[in-house]
Amino acid sequence: MTDRDTVVGHVHGRFQPFHDGHLAYCEWAAGECDELIVGITNADPGHVAAETADPDRDDPRNNPFRYHERHRMITAALSAADPGVPVRVLPFPINRPELWEHYAPADALHLLRVLEPWHEVKADRLREHGRAVTTIEAERTVSGTGIREAMAAEAGAVDREPPGPGGEAGRSADREGAEWRSSVPSAVVAVLDEIDGVDRVGTLYEE
């Protein structure tokens, strides 16, 4: 770091798409540092790899949005939220430690919210390679998988909920859309609409 008193924080994730839980993660991290780097994992096919602790992370259905699209989502959401510190958005290949120095300063403080065992694996991996890590236990309030499934349902690629015991209809496409949009920053919804994100996800779920 150019200034020994400056703390450069680092968060990372796939952000497929960037949702309210991710925004809360970044806002917490911003309170722990003077500058924040948001690292996008699975930035391109060369950075995608199978992980035993997170076996679905390389599934194409779980990676519908390209790096530059996620960069736009994150930049738009954080610009609107104003976390109070300068923010940079860069790739971060969590499964390729030999490349980390190209994307995150060696003395950055890696900040992780632990929601599942995979997050502990990542924290341990960072520590094993000499990285400073701070973790906080948290509960998942938004599911990226749930958002993608709702987007696929809106596109008609997956079945709606079956009728209830009284014969009432399952969820409509309008309700599916309202539900996932309520879990995503409005600036991100605008990007997703512009890139036809619902259709993209729907196509992947149909393959």
Segments (PLM) and residue ranges:
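Nucleotidyltransferase catalytic core that binds NTPs
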Residues: 1-207
